[in-house]
Design a protein with these regions (language model features):
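Extracellular/periplasmic carbohydrate-active domains that bind, remodel
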Residues: 1-339
């Protein structure tokens, strides 16, 4: 798969065939507000008071030399090569024939499109509401949701995973705290929405678990009394919206992520995750965190909007004693220009 991530000399960039999104750290000597000039092949292409800039209308498979300067001098120089134009696998066309009517369950058709997607191809969603259950992604692929496209998870629970919770709507990688990445180079982008069942899905899972754990809860009334509320223990198996386990080089851009049954974007034992120009919504969802790096490194989020039922960003390194035993700390997290 053509490289979409570049980082050197204080500059980092993620690119498509026609765009480059560039970001950098604010200089230590900078004031509250500074103006930065971005140059492409020695010609100024724009200024910004933010520490990121997007270049558009570029040519595919073309090398560009980028330079950022401010009143204190140069920030750095970075050479970026845009990707090839990707062949689109339209989920509504043959052989998938997914139906975006908000009613038809498309899980099998969409999973086939995911499985078929090769390097330098893209699973493409035109406008429509595509109902689906859990989907599993693999290395070296891209999802693109066009404006008006909604990948909508059902309000029914999905099968469980080794995380001892139900599957997320989108599942990337396989959890293994003893290993490095097993899933890499995935792009989720576009102008559409990835959404799940939110409060309804959460409540259905909690009630199902409450019935399943009836005897345990009765026998451990003292433990239950110390919890936040009566839903705490049965609510532990709620799925995420997007789960990234042992992933590397994942880029999420431009999308709206909405209504996970608990956390929305959760990356575990992962590295080099970039999220930008996204909207993350889970208003009214208990524990509805927005963006949670967990025992992960080099994760960056910027230019994003949050309206969440809990933390916008929550940085974690495991849970309870297990986090200390596994001992994989979260490092090098950058959060800027979000609100």
């Amino acid at each position: 798969m053509a490289e979409h991530y570049f980082s050197q000399n204080g500059l980092t960039a993620c690119c498509t065939d026609t765009t480059i999104t560039l970001f950098w750290d604010k200089p230590a000597a900078a004031g509250a507000v500074e103006t930065y000039t971005v140059l492409r092949n020695d010609a100024a292409v724009g200024t910004t008071v933010k520490t990121h800039f997007t270049l558009e209308h570029l040519q595919p498979e073309t090398e560009y030399v980028l330079f950022v300067q401010w009143r204190g001098g140069g920030i750095g120089e970075l050479t970026v090569r845009t990707t090839p134009v990707k062949h689109r696998l339209n989920v509504t066309a043959a052989p998938y024939f997914a139906v975006g009517d908000g009613k038809t369950l498309n899980t099998a058709a969409l999973q086939k499109a995911m499985d078929d997607c090769k390097e330098n191809e893209c699973v493409y969603f035109p406008a429509g509401i595509y109902m689906t259950g859990a989907l599993r992604l693999h290395s070296n692929m891209e999802l693109y949701l066009d404006e008006g496209a909604v990948l909508q998870g059902t309000a029914s629970r999905f099968e469980g995973t080794e995380m001892e919770c139900y599957s997320s709507l989108l599942n990337l990688g396989t959890l293994d705290h003893t290993a490095g990445p097993n899933c890499e180079n995935i792009i989720l982008r576009g102008k559409g929405t990835i959404a799940s069942g939110g409060r309804l899905l959460a409540s259905r899972i909690i009630e199902n678990e409450r019935a399943r754990l009836k005897e345990y809860l009765a026998q451990n009334a003292d433990l239950v009394s110390t919890c936040e509320n009566a839903d705490t223990i049965p609510g532990r198996v709620r799925p995420r919206l997007v789960n990234m386990s042992n992933c590397r080089n994942i880029w999420m851009q431009g999308l709206t992520f909405a209504n996970g049954a608990s956390w929305n974007l959760h990356m575990v034992y992962s590295d080099q995750i970039v999220t930008d120009h996204c909207t993350i919504k889970s208003d009214g969802v208990w524990n509805g965190d927005g963006w949670d790096p967990d025992s992960s490194t080099n994760c960056t989020i910027f230019a994003c909007e949050f309206c969440t039922g809990d933390d916008a960003v929550a940085i974690k390194s495991g849970k309870n004693p297990e986090g200390n035993i596994i001992n994989r700390p979260t490092k090098h997290i950058r959060v800027f220009d979000c609100h």
